[in-house]
Amino acid sequence: ILLALCAGSGSGVLLATKWQLSALPQIVALLNGIGGLASALIVCCPFKYHKDNLLESLCVVIGLVAFSGSIVAFAKLHGLLRKNVAWLKWVSLFLEILLLINIAYFTYFQQGFAGIILLSILIGFCAIMPIGGADMPVIISLLNSFSGWAVVTVGLLAGDLLLIITGTLVGASGTILSYVMCKSMNRSLLKIVWPETQSIETEHKSTGIV
């Protein structure tokens, strides 16, 4: 445990000192993803305190959506992903199909995490990919809340009050911050998370002109 603490602390210090301050959004997105992945990995391990298959599956979904979505946000902010409007127009439809499949998996197949892991990663990717850079601060804050709620589910499974409290603080603060930013932008969170095809095309065309 001490070795893991030293490795994690050293990596965090190295990450914070080597990157410039202008790259702070990318760092926050990356740390959000790592937090969500950690929660999902803990639940996937065969610990003896696991009691609720539904709660375990919920933790995996929230954690991996936060992880894959944060990786996409990091890559977009860092300029690693190219924008292709031709296939982005179909991402929303594909996301709806994935959500329906995930609901069906929750209902009929509650044993095992293989299907949920794959679906959650794809959902996180498809949900964040169409979103433009102007809305990315809201998305990063929302993903931050996801990582906090994933910690809450781990705390509920483990019966750990400290995890529940800290996860609730992170989740609630991220949710409130997302709401405040949407209100200041005079936009709906649903419109940001689920952008229309026309707005995607308009944004990418204006980005190309600039």
Describe the residue ranges of each PLM region.
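C-terminal ends of transmembrane helices
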Residues: 10-28, 70-84, 123-136, 178-182
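Membrane-interfacial segments at transmembrane helix termini in multi-pass membrane proteins
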Residues: 169-210
